[in-house]
A protein has these predicted regions:
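Non-heme Fe(II)/2-oxoglutarate
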Residues: 2-101, 112, 119-122
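Residue-level "micro-hotspots" composed of small/polar
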Residues: 104
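Catalytic core of non-heme Fe(II) oxygenases with the double-stranded beta-helix
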Residues: 109-185, 195, 202, 212, ...
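Short, charged beta-turn/beta-strand-edge "cap" motif at the junction between a beta-strand
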Residues: 190-193
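A domain-level signal for the structural core that forms small-molecule/cofactor-binding pockets
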Residues: 205
Length: 223
């Protein structure tokens, strides 16, 4: 909801009005602390740069992406990352459900790192969870220049959320230009995709699913 003031030209009336957005999903955005980005990149380097580990951790058969590598990582082995994910998931829950999670509820995470190069993309898809999220860890050195040179709809390397059918007076998509450290959390059923890019170098992101387990589920929350 936003409060606005409009002055009419004919009668010089000052009219206060509100605009509500009562429908549609919410997307949480926060800046991930640099030390967390560093920790995830260290773990990513450890697996991605080792062919044996890359094969052992390969998660691509469970995902939709047409990308270089997708490898599973265990955030339980990086406590501060797990705590951060838990904190953001609880914040999203409180904001959307308007109450605290039920006593005894638990949160579980499944996470992976996506390593993309020129021409790689991720088609439209959804996730099988309650919430899903992404954090951007690396971008190709020439990406900003490539993005700036696009002379029409700028989509290179972007993440796009697709929320509804196109219609008048309603946004049906939300385009995100990736910035290292930006973190997004959203409902797992929200369709999204990643566009290809041409720049040399790696576009690396951290992706995850959130599963809530509750002793006393809240009405309207599918767990």
């Amino acid at each position: 909801m936003s409060e606005n003031v409009e002055q009419t030209q004919t009668k010089k009336l000052e009219l206060k009005y509100d605009i509500y957005q009562p429908f549609g999903p919410s997307v949480l955005k926060v800046r991930m602390p640099q030390q967390f980005v560093n920790s995830l990149n260290v773990e990513g380097d450890r697996i991605l740069h080792d062919e044996k580990l890359s094969k052992e951790h390969d998660w691509s058969h469970n995902l939709a992406g047409n990308v270089k590598k997708e490898v599973m990582i265990d955030v339980n082995k990086i406590p501060r990352i797990r705590e951060f994910l838990g904190s953001m998931s609880q914040a999203y829950y409180r904001h959307t459900i308007k109450q605290e999670p039920a006593p005894g509820s638990k949160v579980a995470f499944r996470s992976w790192i996506v390593s993309q190069y020129a021409g790689d993309f991720n088609p439209m898809h959804i996730h099988d969870a309650n919430l899903s999220g992404v954090a951007f860890l690396k971008m190709p050195p020439g990406f900003d220049e490539e993005y700036a040179k696009e002379d029409h709809h700028k989509t290179a390397g972007c993440l796009e959320f697709l929320g509804s059918m196109p219609n008048h007076f309603a946004n049906h998509s939300y385009l995100v230009k990736p910035e290292v450290g930006d973190f997004y959390l959203f409902p797992s059923w929200l369709t999204h995709q990643v566009y290809p890019f041409r720049s040399e170098g790696e576009r690396r992101s951290f992706a995850f699913n959130v599963h809530f387990t509750m002793d006393n589920p809240v009405k309207g929350v599918d767990v």
